[in-house]
From Swiss-Prot:
The lineage of its organism: Eukaryota, Metazoa, Chordata, Craniata, Vertebrata. SMART domains: GLA. Residues 51-97 form the Gla domain. This is Matrix Gla protein. GO terms for cellular component: extracellular matrix; extracellular space; protein-containing complex. SUPFAM superfamilies: GLA-domain. Belongs to the osteocalcin/matrix Gla protein family. It comes from Rattus norvegicus. The gene is Mgp.
Amino acid sequence: MKSLLPLAILAALAVAALCYESHESMESYEVSPFTTRRNANTFISPQQRWHAKAQERVRELNKPAQEINREACDDYKLCERYALIYGYNAAYNRYFRQRRGAK
């Protein structure tokens, strides 16, 4: 019992010494990781936003046929399951090629 009190004091001092919070840890300017909607919109200028949207439209128009077929297959659950086993090309041919009239 006599050795318990000095041991508890020693443990408390060790915790205080190891858990000391220095001033350096408070120097971070990221007090809050979240930002307001107004500040979020200032990162990208309207011209850059317009350019990015235009590029996305161009990419959508110039997609390869295989990617368009895969997206159509992804939207249909049975086709997607079939594609996991036999591949997207075979799945698209099975579920969608007949509907378009091609053989």
